[in-house]
């Protein structure tokens, strides 16, 4: 990459809201980022600090003000500024999970969640009590962090304009964007005038409410996040992926801004940095998210690379990585780069039936082969690492690759369990292969818990134990449940945008008029690289299916290219369509097994954001089935 010089703001974020880290690790991380060229640590806290105004967190789920002051003091000695992030609108679940706080939630009384969220995560922006609490809490947090900056979040606010007070404001002429702009403006006035700090916000809600941007003070600092593989021109996250030159727009309106890539992909960091360097950002913020099932060590090589890149010192990935590990060659460097690509495009699945997705795809085969090769390469270098910290990083990567082995094994095992041909296993075989999988998961969990004891000593590991133990038990249950399945509903989906959140329900109707819901949920491609993907949904009614009813609602729409039912004796395929309702486009395509697709739902994202009631509208059709006897 071309050397673009040092950015003024060189930050990295540590997500302590989703997973607490020990103070010792935070100190270690500060040492690491200081050597990597960063001058700012952003602590994503939400409601992680217990204070007088927020005394509800119980032991083991909070930091004290004194602990955070110690972190700030330590960082200051390393010339690292520490900025807190307290979510004052969305992502407020750490606050709103407490019964004493529920009266401040947007979803209260008769209010309904826009995207059918099961937890309260949004403060009501219309309640004076909300602002009173937030002012008190932010004042306490500001006293801990002397930084000139204060980050208030405000991203991904799904339940907005839902409560009776907000609805009345909209009925009386305000728009969702007006309500958002007023809230941001009021928050800015408090932070600027009473706390004496510059306010930072995430920028994605301004995609949803573009008119709000011109209504807020332009000394609000916008944090522009984008996690696409290549950021040649940013695409909106929640508005039909509208392409827009956001940084040019922000400069034209006089805003200061920070660009924020993620540790998901090397290419994301590099391309977003290149794009941003054409303009005049304050700098970059590398965002690290949600490490409750993983550890920070795995991403620390990328943290180092971004820090060197932004400080204008190292512009070569290989040199930066060799600096971390004290060893390596081109094979090692290429393996590490590809490993981050694999991690981003093949995330963890924690539902056994999500592995029932047809034959392994060409892309999965490439990932499987690359993962196995990378594991062999990293194992060779483990003992050559320059220090314990480097070994922890490589070990963490190797343990994650073990999970990849489990995932690919599950892909073949679950397909075998739900096969309905001559390969269909007997109950003894079913119990054997599920027990074998359970043993693999047990060994993996033991390694994760051993890591936990070393990396997060004193912090409860109940979450990770519960998650993987429940997953293991569900895998064991497949031996019995798969044997009872009468067949599977196989659906070929088309989803052009991974940010869509369109719910879909498939109901099978049988010859006697009885029904069974085969599946209901939001379905996405776990590979994250192809708009087309397959899922198979088991059903258990032994009577002959005659039709499938499809219903779809919520956000963004969903395409269905084809579906069929495969039972123990027959195959059933769509022959005609009836009972169409709502917005269903290109209906006839669903009758032919090719790459054309029928699309259900609203495609106008802007309309959905401005009128959330549209997300409740049902779109659907019924497919009448014909029977094709298996030879």
Residue ranges of model-derived segments:
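Mature N-terminal, pre-catalytic/accessory segment of carbohydrate-active enzymes
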Residues: 1-46, 62-63, 148, 387-493, ...
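Substrate-binding groove of N-acetylhexosamine-processing glycoside hydrolases
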Residues: 31, 70-73, 128-139, 143, ...
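Noncatalytic modules at the cell exterior or secretory-pathway interfaces
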Residues: 485-491, 540-551
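Short beta-strand-plus-loop segments that form exposed binding edges in beta-rich domains
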Residues: 493-497, 549-556
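Short, surface-exposed beta-strand/strand-loop-strand elements in extracellular ectodomains
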Residues: 502-513, 561-566
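Surface-exposed loop/edge segments in extracytoplasmic proteins
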Residues: 513-520, 570-574
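Extracellular carbohydrate recognition and processing domains
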Residues: 516-540, 582-586, 591
